[in-house]
Swiss-Prot record:
Family label: Belongs to the IFIT family.
InterPro entries: TPR-like_helical_dom_sf (IPR011990), TPR_rpt (IPR019734)
Subunit description: Domain-swapped homodimer. Component of an interferon-dependent multiprotein complex, at least composed of IFIT1, IFIT2 and IFIT3. Interacts with IFIT1 and IFIT3. Interacts with STING1/MITA and disrupts its interaction with MAVS or TBK1. Interacts with EIF3C.
PANTHER family hit by this protein: INTERFERON-INDUCED PROTEIN WITH TETRATRICOPEPTIDE REPEATS (PTHR10271), INTERFERON-INDUCED PROTEIN WITH TETRATRICOPEPTIDE REPEATS 2 (PTHR10271:SF4)
Species in which this protein is naturally found: Mus musculus
Protein name in the entry: Interferon-induced protein with tetratricopeptide repeats 2
Subcellular location as annotated: Cytoplasm; Endoplasmic reticulum
Region described as Disordered: 441-472
Gene this protein is translated from: Ifit2
Main function: IFN-induced antiviral protein which inhibits expression of viral messenger RNAs lacking 2'-O-methylation of the 5' cap. The ribose 2'-O-methylation would provide a molecular signature to distinguish between self and non-self mRNAs by the host during viral infection. Viruses evolved several ways to evade this restriction system such as encoding their own 2'-O-methylase for their mRNAs or by stealing host cap containing the 2'-O-methylation (cap snatching mechanism). Binds AU-rich viral RNAs, with or without 5' triphosphorylation, RNA-binding is required for antiviral activity.
Keywords recorded for this protein, A-Z: Acetylation, Antiviral defense, Apoptosis, Cytoplasm, Endoplasmic reticulum, Immunity, Innate immunity, Repeat, RNA-binding, TPR repeat
GO molecular function, one term: RNA binding
Claim: Endoplasmic reticulum is one of the keywords in the record: yes
Length: 472
């Protein structure tokens, strides 16, 4: 193929609406992270999205240099389109054909790439456009792809489904996608609007169990219609007790309403289908960890000799969290939660190992602060290493993000400093801590006449093994 012909081919390929032109992988995201998020998170694991998932998988296979495998995935996508959309095969196949054209282009098989471009062109010409048309089915497919693949494009997703609804306002699939996009946007626009959109989607798709559970979660979040929320979840589970995305969201609902036993029951069902899914093991571990802390809060149970039950729960939590960590090492909080459980079990070497592992991760500011708070507490209370506790509290305060953990670390540092000054007015480390607090956003000056300083002198940092991510 001549240079001019190749440039023309590329120009036409760029006009296609398909996964190769939608910029689905964020610039700061690795292919491994992208693939894990797309194929292991809980949304859209069910049969109605098989064609969509095959197209996404084909794109991932190509990115990994597995073009033959990509072609096989596209062939499977064509088969699912014919099964699920027999009345719209041509329109629904445009994205798949576009992906075919791009894969063959990258394989150097330009004639085959052109053949698929021609197939797209034949359909688009019916709408007076060479390679790109405005069609609600295409907007819908782009919306599902972005909803599944992207992290921060929910506004763009909403626009895709909104465009589709302008042409077909009562379409159940478009309405469901639009409602899910609003759910993802969470607090903006107002939650009542999100609830309205989910209710509208259910009216048009009464069998959509996933949307029912999303509505239940939203109703619970705004603290209204608790009975309706519970009824929606039970109805969804009765209608389709094996749908993975419904099971996982329902488990999340039961966690939020403090029914961890029911959540664990649903997660066990999910594990039967996804035995090596890190996220399901992680959620299971978190549920068992929640039961551990609930039992610890009921101190009379521990003191009355029910230590064996506590140890069993700790081991179940550890087993699932370790399994999750083995499958996917970068899960947020997994190592911190393991460290927490080992502290409760008084296995401090194991706890320190997982704290160190978590510290080695590249965490966002909020989780990093929380980690320094937890590790500082561990050093102060369990290891009796005040120097190391001070170091980690300071490291957490240095992170320029106002959070509850940061506030707690300031308070802990101030109490440590004031207590030391109460014992020795010239304690250089205590004076250094107070100067550090002043330099990093304020703190109490070393003033021996300060009533607050005297009152604080005999206090120590408060201990909390269960200082969770909800704090920041």
């Amino acid at each position: 193929m001549s240079t001019t012909s190749k440039e023309s081919l590329v120009c036409n390929l760029r006009q296609l609406k398909c996964h190769f032109t939608w910029n689905l992988i964020a610039e700061d995201e690795s292919l491994d992270e992208f693939e894990d998020r797309v194929f292991n998170k809980d949304e859209f694991q069910n049969s109605e999205f098989k064609a969509t998932m095959c197209n996404i998988l084909a794109y991932v296979k190509h990115c990994r240099g597995l073009n033959e495998a990509a072609l096989q995935c596209l062939g499977e996508a064509e088969g699912f389109i014919q099964q699920q959309h027999p009345d719209q095969v041509e329109i629904r196949s445009l994205v798949t054909w576009g992906n075919y054209a791009w894969v063959y282009y990258h394989m150097g098989q330009f004639s085959k790439a052109q053949a698929y471009l021609d197939k797209v062109k034949q359909v688009c010409k019916k709408f007076s456009s060479p390679y790109r048309i405005e069609n609600p089915a295409l907007d819908c497919e782009e919306g599902w792809a972005r909803l599944k693949c992207t992290k921060n494009q929910n506004e763009r997703v909403k626009v895709c489904f909104q465009k589709a609804l302008e042409k077909d306002p009562k379409n159940p699939e478009f309405t469901s996608g639009w409602a899910i996009a609003f759910y993802r946007l969470d607090d903006w626009p107002a939650r009542n609007y999100c609830i309205d959109s989910l209710e509208q989607a259910i009216q048009l798709s009464p069998d959509n169990t996933y949307v029912k559970v999303l509505l239940a979660l939203k109703l619970d979040a705004v603290h209204v219609h608790k009975n309706q929320a519970m009824a929606l979840v039970e109805e969804a589970l009765k209608k389709d007790p094996s749908a993975i995305d419904t099971l996982l969201r329902a488990a999340r609902f039961y966690c939020k309403v403090y029914d961890t036993d029911r959540a664990i029951q649903l997660l066990r069902k999910a594990l039967e289908k996804l035995p090596n899914n890190a996220y399901v093991h992680y959620y299971m571990g978190c549920c068992y960890r929640s039961k551990v802390h609930h039992m610890l809060n009921r101190r009379e149970m521990v003191f009355s000799g029910d230590r064996k039950k506590l140890e069993e729960l700790i081991q179940l939590a550890v087993n699932h969290l370790r399994k999750a960590e083995e499958i996917k090492e970068m899960l947020e909080y997994s190592c911190s939660f393991l460290a927490d459980l080992y502290i409760i079990a008084k296995k401090y070497d194991e706890a320190d190992y997982y704290f160190q592992k978590e510290l080695s991760k590249d965490l966002p500011p909020g989780p990093k602060q929380l980690l320094h708070l937890r590790y500082g507490n561990f050093q102060f209370f369990q290891m009796k290493r005040q120097d190391k506790a001070i170091y980690h509290y300071m490291e957490g305060v240095k992170i320029k993000k106002k959070t509850i953990p940061q506030k707690k670390m300031r308070e802990k540092l101030q109490r440590i400093a004031l207590r030391r000054l109460h014992e020795d007015e010239s304690d250089s480390e205590a004076l250094h801590i107070l100067a550090f607090l002043q330099e990093n956003g304020g703190g109490q000056q070393a003033d021996k006449d300060s009533e607050r300083g005297v009152d604080s002198a005999n206090q120590v940092p408060s201990a909390s093994l269960d200082e969770d991510g909800a704090e920041y």
